[in-house]
Amino acid sequence: MLNFLENHDEQRIASDFFAGDPRKGVPALIVSACMNTNPMMIYFGQEFGEMGMDSEGFSGRDGRTTIFDYWSVDTIRRWRNEGKFDGKMLTEEQKHLYAIYQRVLTLCNEEQAISNGVFFDLMYANENGWRFNEHKQYTFMRKYKNELLFIVVNFDNQPVNVAINVPSHAFDFLQIPQFDSYKAVDLLTDKVEEISLLPY
């Protein structure tokens, strides 16, 4: 099954009718792209923060991008740059968002735990958590052979520090040793830190 966040039927993430800010879609992008091995569709300018706020033809100004009318959208025109396809006309914010999309989608192809691995949901072990709000954060694990990914996303507008419970069943299911310390690499920032995995 195809995963997606935007299509011609849905209001754009960045539109005034939905989130109003394309950066608010990044946590959902990470979850949708990394949760399973399914393909991820990026829709016509989504990676640049297309707002879909033009008043175009059949549908009018509704936060969507028409597929029924002969139309072009601002972000794609900027990315095309009069046929150079170099993105030089994109704003700095659009370039930054594009870099995030490129990084996440590249990880989906490079990381075997995402493209071929098993999934373990951690949400059931983190309801009413001491330092985890199940309404604002989401977490799961992916594993393939010796590669383990611990994915945590924050849907809140504020940065947070979280503590995540890993149930003992996860260690059995994923065949990972308990009470070990690991060198963890943040795949979006390349920051390295030591973490300990203790069963809950």
Where are these regions (language model features)?
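Short, glycine/acidic-rich beta->alpha junctions
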Residues: 20-26, 132
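Long, well-ordered alpha-helical scaffolding segments within enzyme catalytic domains
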Residues: 24-31, 99-100
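Residue-level detector of alpha-helix boundaries and kinks
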Residues: 17, 30, 86-90
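Residue-level signal for well-ordered alpha-helical scaffold segments within enzymatic catalytic domains
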Residues: 3, 31, 103-106
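Active-site region of glycoside hydrolase catalytic domains
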Residues: 29-41
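Conserved catalytic core of Hanks-type protein kinase domains
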Residues: 7, 35, 107
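Carbohydrate-interacting/catalytic domains
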Residues: 39-42, 46-200
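Active-site clefts of carbohydrate-active enzymes
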Residues: 1-20
